[in-house]
Amino acid sequence: MSEKVKFEKRESLKEKPDTANLGFGQYFTDYMLSVDYDADQGWHDMKIVPYAPFEISPAAQGLHYGQAVFEGLKAYKHNGEVVLFRPDQNFKRINNSLARLEMPEVDEEALLEGLKQLVDVERDWVPEGEGQSLYIRPFVFATEGILGVRSSHQYKLLIILSPSGAYYGGDTLKSTKIYVEDEYVRAVRGGVGFAKVAGNYAASLLAQTNANKLGYDQVLWLDGVEQKYVEEVGSMNIFFVENGKVVTPALNGSILPGITRKSIIQLAEDLGYEVEERRVSIEELFNAYDKGELTEVFGSGTAAVISPVGTLRYEDREIVINNNEPGKITQKLYDTYTGIQSGKLEDKYGWRVEVPKY
């Protein structure tokens, strides 16, 4: 039997929000998981504590030099059962991110067990409505109070939970407008593009704001060397349907290896679609569109799962894909993926991990 994580009970519980108006990342549960690290003890003192502000040194290295990584995954409730979706993949990826920033890796099994116990404590916070979930945010940051530029000797890991509404506000997929960024770059090979580090997202905000001002929802990034090849969207990996084939940029060290991406590729192949992972130039996409060969575009990520792209703008040209409607392949993949997540469809892959009652 797994060892029980220490539990610090709060005096009173919060009033839970109206599940009809959850939005994303606006509400937080009563408790969080906390783990500390120092060079002598390693990772230690895992405990479930009340969600609350905490003290940190003004000289904490994470504030100055950016040693901070995070993850995002979800828990679902179906017929009273609470499950996590592919949490092992998230903890493998957080270790890859930690290693890249010279931060101490975590015990994946111990952390998964701690997460299960946290979600069990908070199972009443898991919404059960269509498309709703409990968003899970693990993150690690340097806490040692010293201004020397070196790897910190002290860190904190927290996991916070946020009940979240349906991304689209219902069952119908809604197409997004994407701006292809040709001035700024997100990442270069040899850098940290493959890692889920805080700085990647900070560096993307200016381009994202500029795109929003022009009426676009997100930015599609090109490679950082030639600014010719498509890489990823701000919060999603990207897929194209060309001549009936599902095409996505190959992982090259500057693209985040999305867990949803990985799952979608496997589902697409099992549904009988031909999948290609390769370099995709922006010129190829617009040429394929002109020939009538580019029929669908969609993004994949934890928040939206699948987000159809209806409009794509590059330089002074804007194209509308599939009359701004989700394509058949996009819809099929979305329905299958979310069906497995929610428990409505059989999970032959073992992706759903049950949260036991401790």
UniProtKB/Swiss-Prot annotation:
The modification N6-(pyridoxal phosphate)lysine is found at residue 196. It is an enzyme of class 2 (transferase). InterPro entries: Aminotrans_IV, Aminotrans_IV_CS, Aminotransferase-like, B_amino_transII, BCAT-like_C, BCAT-like_N, BCAT_family. Its EC number is 2.6.1.42. It catalyses: L-leucine + 2-oxoglutarate = 4-methyl-2-oxopentanoate + L-glutamate; L-isoleucine + 2-oxoglutarate = (S)-3-methyl-2-oxopentanoate + L-glutamate; L-valine + 2-oxoglutarate = 3-methyl-2-oxobutanoate + L-glutamate. Keywords: Amino-acid biosynthesis, Aminotransferase, Branched-chain amino acid biosynthesis, Pyridoxal phosphate, Transferase. Its cofactor is pyridoxal 5'-phosphate. GO terms for biological process: isoleucine biosynthetic process; L-leucine biosynthetic process; L-valine biosynthetic process. Pfam families: Aminotran_4. The keyword Isomerase does not apply. Pathway: Amino-acid biosynthesis; L-isoleucine biosynthesis; L-isoleucine from 2-oxobutanoate: step 4/4; Amino-acid biosynthesis; L-leucine biosynthesis; L-leucine from 3-methyl-2-oxobutanoate: step 4/4; Amino-acid biosynthesis; L-valine biosynthesis; L-valine from pyruvate: step 4/4. GO terms for molecular function: L-isoleucine-2-oxoglutarate transaminase activity; L-leucine-2-oxoglutarate transaminase activity; L-valine-2-oxoglutarate transaminase activity. Belongs to the class-IV pyridoxal-phosphate-dependent aminotransferase family. Acts on leucine, isoleucine and valine. This is Probable branched-chain-amino-acid aminotransferase.
